[in-house]
């Protein structure tokens, strides 16, 4: 029988990992609100589009997580690796396809949602860089599924902290041009988010 403390020690890192992706959007909003209303609106639209695509990968990883947890519970540890590898490869292919889809049709979709020409242009500038994050965030959710499935969820806490801190520092640096980096505005926010996702993936893959 598990105690409440044991259950909480496993579950709270999962909660933090769920919040991590949203923290990126909140951080972008906080910094871009100091740039202009156009940048703020564009990051909101671009961030929402990104999250909608991201949930496709998240849904697949949840299914993989169930399989991994079952293999782990059955003590079939050797079967966990193949599930993980297949999941990563599948999500990388999915990331490539959705990257291409967004490049080809993202502008048309935004035209239907955004009436302001200036916000549309800023949104597309944001997305042109932000969608490179697909390749990192899609693999990220597969590692999340692995660590939850084998109940090593404390790794997710470190991952969430690394992602949040990296994004805050790089947002400040790239949006406003600090630490010797160029002032890039909304494009800087997108690049910072992608690098933050890459940094968190590096932490997961090296644990």
Feature-to-residue mapping (PLM):
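Signature of the first transmembrane helix
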Residues: 5-65
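Small-residue-rich hydrophobic transmembrane alpha-helices
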Residues: 40-103, 137-151, 155-156
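Alpha-helical transmembrane segments of multi-pass membrane transporters
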Residues: 102, 155-184, 198-199, 203-204
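Short alpha-helical transmembrane segments in multi-pass integral membrane proteins
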Residues: 1-11, 68-133, 181-207
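Alpha-helical transmembrane segments and their helix-entry boundary regions
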Residues: 29, 40, 153-157, 186-190
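Short runs within selected transmembrane alpha-helices of multi-pass transporters and secretion channels
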Residues: 61, 65, 130-149, 156-167, ...
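Helix-terminus/linker motif at the lipid-water interface of multi-pass membrane proteins
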Residues: 19, 23-41, 110-117, 173-184
């Amino acid at each position: 029988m598990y105690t409440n403390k044991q259950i909480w020690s496993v579950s709270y890192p999962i909660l933090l990992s769920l919040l991590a992706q949203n923290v990126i959007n909140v951080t972008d909003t906080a910094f871009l609100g100091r740039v202009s209303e156009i940048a703020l609106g564009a990051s909101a639209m671009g961030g929402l589009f990104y999250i909608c695509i991201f949930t496709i990968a998240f849904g697949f990883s949840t299914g993989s997580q169930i399989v991994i947890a079952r293999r782990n519970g059955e003590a079939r540890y050797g079967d966990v690796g193949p599930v993980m590898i297949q999941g990563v490869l599948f999500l990388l292919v999915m990331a490539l396809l959705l990257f291409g889809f967004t490049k080809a049709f993202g502008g048309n979709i935004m035209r239907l949602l955004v009436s302001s020409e200036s916000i549309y242009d800023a949104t597309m500038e944001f997305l042109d860089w932000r969608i490179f994050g697909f390749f990192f965030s899609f693999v990220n959710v597969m590692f999340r599924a692995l660590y939850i499935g084998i109940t090593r969820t404390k790794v997710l806490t470190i991952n969430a902290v690394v992602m949040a801190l990296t994004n805050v520092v790089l947002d400040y640096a790239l949006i406003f041009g600090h630490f010797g980096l160029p002032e890039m505005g909304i494009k800087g926010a997108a690049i910072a988010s992608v690098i933050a996702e890459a940094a968190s993936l590096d932490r997961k893959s090296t644990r």
